[in-house]
């Protein structure tokens, strides 16, 4: 019996192991896996139904039509004889093919690629001093559904692209549904929502060739942002490591806009929302991201689902920055209505107000993650919007887009979107209406339905629009003068980074602009960089082989904000993946002990061996292999531990693969490549026994930063765990070319 049967390795497709032969005994459908959860069983009008959690799933032992007619065959069409034509009367064929032809709905025009999870939000109560929102009262628990996403790519695009990530949360409160529709970057490309089609058209694939997919390294994107310079601040964040997060679990979230909280007395406070991951904010490195997109395009989806399945539930604290609701809505010289600006945490600390835990995967991607509909206008009493010109347009766009994507105005009745509060809305009929409304008077006022529905007062939780005095002005198309500064916050962000992070920004700009065909676009963007930081501009220009232009704008300086840096802290390692390389030379008792130690630390151990199956010792239990040299790549693992000698697998071709390692060595070149890549990417590496020779073959000094070796897992695994808490061995990243 394999020793790791007690260790849960996530990723099983079903709750039961399949039989070798096709099952023939009739039985009910299998239940969802323990880590899965569907939408709450509530009616289209928000009433709890009391039905089982999976009551909306398929039922019965036998295959039926959509009308419940049992079928005895679904493998053959009805024909006029075995070689004759198919008959039009084949109702099963027509239903099956017709439904298949209409399975797809329009994908989101942005944020098409996403992953979701269920969870709970528990309020600390600290926000109850400034808002009457019931779900923010002390110790209130609220069900949530979260969808993470990329922005530019299509639904089938890769996860680890350089892009902004969406971070949207649906709170099912007893006062109605509240949606916090955010991103992993606190600023946006544009100030006014009328420019949203422009930035997305520029970032999407070129319309003639439909390339490139899910990336900004092309002419149309840089043509737009170099001309429309209010996009420079967001672009700077995107070129940083924030644009390639390690995981959704290690991603910060931001509400982007300034919102207004309202207390019971009507007093208002301006706030910005923040999600702070308990695991810290961590990213990939660019080479690693590129390899991942080829090896595992579903990297972020898989990571989130596997973490939840293995019990390493992701957690974020919700926090707020608070500001006085003054007439000018400015704070420390920064316009709070400008979505291209953020407020450094050193000026306005983030105050935690609650904890979100994601603890269940969806049971059906389409029904939940694809059909969920977020909208920043889904508000509850105590939370209101501001006059941010991007937010104001989103209030229209997010409602409008659901009508085409989800087939009509009744998208709130889709199970994942149903409120957990009573719904009496006087909205009737329409496509896909699933409520069965009673009464004869869906209008107000009425007497025929007894006057119901009645208007609510504040004493029973009515939403009241904040009375706001509008300054005298004229109707015009222009921004306030405070929106004119396009460079100072990009400078603030860049100069707040460590030298290593600055170097990554330089590399990102150099890569992206190097992919642009037109030199004029590269030159124009260099002019923008010159207005941000001369050293940054010079380093990127050098990489492009172009002269560095001089600044044309006198950009004001600001105090750096260390809070935006990702380097320097120590963080939990829950859910991290550790690859353990083993083979016939390994002491399998030590391999088993290593797996136990990794698992006990809350991480996921995966054994990598020359081939799949099991490693069999002369005595004692065997060890199951999760990855072979053929299927493994360093990018799947946060750390690699070498417990074997890298014996070549049967499918190794040294003559072809030697270029990946050191010619002439008696190791499988893919093992050398795996270890070498892990070293290049700053990952923790451990070794014992024959593993030391593998490090030598890869040219890795055993006293290099982030490298540990010892007699066995009892000494190596604790050091690896400590190294992982810093995410990477940052000492391996010399900041060559970083700006001062």
Each language-model region and where it sits:
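Active-site-adjacent core segments of small-molecule enzymes
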Residues: 2-585, 592-600, 604, 609-631, ...
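Catalytic nucleophile loop
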Residues: 518, 639-645, 667-697
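Short glycine-/acidic-enriched loop or helix-start segments at secondary-structure transitions
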Residues: 590, 651-654, 695-698
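Glycine-centered loop/turn motif at secondary-structure junctions
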Residues: 601-603, 682, 699
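Short gly/pro/ser/thr-enriched loop/turn and capping motifs at secondary-structure boundaries
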Residues: 612-615, 693-695, 714-715
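A short, aliphatic-rich alpha-helical micro-motif
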Residues: 634-635
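A charged, well-structured terminal subsegment
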Residues: 704-740
């Amino acid at each position: 019996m394999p020793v790791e049967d007690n260790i849960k390795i996530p990723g099983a497709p079903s709750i039961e192991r399949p039989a070798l032969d096709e099952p023939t005994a009739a039985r009910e459908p299998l239940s969802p896996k323990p880590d899965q959860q569907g939408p709450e069983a509530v009616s289209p009008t928000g009433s709890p139904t009391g039905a089982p959690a999976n009551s909306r799933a398929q039922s019965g032992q036998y295959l039926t039509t959509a009308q419940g007619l049992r079928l005895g065959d679904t493998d053959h069409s009805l024909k006029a004889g075995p070689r004759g034509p198919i008959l039009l009367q084949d109702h099963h064929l027509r239903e099956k093919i017709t439904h298949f032809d209409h399975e797809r709905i329009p994908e989101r025009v942005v944020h098409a690629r996403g992953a979701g999870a269920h969870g709970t939000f528990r309020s600390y109560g600290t926000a109850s001093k400034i808002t009457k929102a019931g779900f923010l009262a002390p110790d209130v628990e609220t069900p949530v559904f979260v969808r993470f996403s990329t922005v530019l790519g299509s639904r089938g695009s890769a996860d680890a692209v350089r892009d902004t990530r969406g971070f949207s949360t649906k709170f099912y409160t007893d006062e109605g549904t509240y949606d916090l529709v955010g991103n992993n970057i606190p600023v946006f490309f544009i100030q006014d929502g009328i420019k949203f089609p422009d930035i997305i058209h520029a970032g999407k694939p070129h319309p003639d060739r439909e390339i490139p997919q899910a990336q900004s390294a092309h002419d149309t994107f840089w043509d737009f942002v170099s001309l429309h310079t209010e996009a420079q601040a967001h672009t700077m964040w995107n070129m940083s490591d924030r644009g390639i997060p390690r995981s959704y679990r290690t991603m910060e979230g931001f509400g982007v806009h300034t919102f207004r909280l309202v207390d019971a007395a009507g007093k208002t406070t301006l706030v910005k929302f923040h999600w702070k991951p308990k695991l810290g904010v961590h990213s990939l490195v660019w080479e690693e991201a590129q390899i991942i997109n080829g090896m595992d395009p579903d990297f972020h989806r898989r990571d989130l689902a596997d973490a939840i399945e293995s019990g390493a539930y992701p957690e974020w604290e919700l926090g707020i920055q608070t500001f006085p609701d003054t007439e000018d809505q400015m704070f420390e010289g920064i316009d709070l209505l400008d979505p291209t600006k953020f407020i450094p945490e050193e000026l306005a600390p983030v105050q935690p107000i609650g904890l979100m835990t994601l603890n269940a995967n969806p049971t059906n991607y389409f029904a939940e993650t694809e059909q969920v509909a977020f909208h920043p206008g889904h508000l509850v009493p105590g939370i209101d919007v501001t006059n941010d010109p991007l937010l104001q347009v989103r209030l229209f766009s997010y409602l409008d887009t659901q009508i085409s994507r989800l087939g009509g105005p009744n998208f709130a009745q889709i199970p994942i979107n149903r409120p957990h509060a009573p719904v009496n809305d006087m909205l009737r009929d329409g496509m896909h209406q699933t409520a069965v409304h009673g009464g004869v008077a869906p209008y107000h006022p009425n007497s025929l339905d007894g006057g119901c529905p009645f208007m609510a007062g504040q004493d029973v939780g009515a939403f009241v629009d904040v009375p706001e005095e509008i300054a005298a002005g004229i109707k015009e198309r222009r921004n306030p003068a405070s929106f004119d500064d396009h460079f100072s916050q990009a400078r603030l962000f860049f100069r707040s980074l460590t030298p290593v992070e600055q170097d990554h920004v330089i590399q990102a700009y150099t890569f992206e602009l190097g992919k642009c065909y037109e030199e004029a676009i590269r030159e124009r963007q260099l002019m923008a960089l010159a207005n941000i930081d001369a050293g940054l501009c010079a380093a990127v220009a050098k990489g492009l082989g172009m002269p560095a232009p001089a600044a044309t704008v006198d950009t004001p300086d600001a105090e750096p904000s260390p809070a935006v840096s990702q380097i320097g802290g120590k963080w939990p390692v829950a859910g991290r993946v550790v690859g353990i390389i083993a083979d016939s030379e390994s002491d399998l008792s030590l391999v088993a002990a290593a797996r136990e130690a990794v698992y006990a630390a809350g991480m996921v151990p995966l054994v990598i061996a020359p081939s799949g199956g099991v490693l069999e010792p002369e005595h004692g239990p065997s060890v199951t292999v999760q990855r072979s040299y053929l299927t493994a790549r360093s990018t799947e693992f946060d750390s690699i531990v070498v417990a074997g000698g890298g014996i070549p697998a049967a499918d190794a071709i040294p003559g072809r693969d030697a270029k990946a390692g050191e010619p002439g060595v008696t190791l499988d070149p893919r093992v050398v490549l795996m270890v070498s890549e892990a070293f290049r990417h700053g990952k923790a590496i451990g070794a014992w026994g024959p593993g030391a020779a593998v490090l030598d073959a890869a040219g890795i000094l055993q006293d290099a930063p982030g490298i540990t070796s010892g007699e066995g897992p009892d000494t190596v695994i604790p050091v690896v765990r400590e190294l992982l808490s810093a995410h990477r061995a940052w000492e391996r990243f010399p900041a060559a070319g970083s700006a001062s």
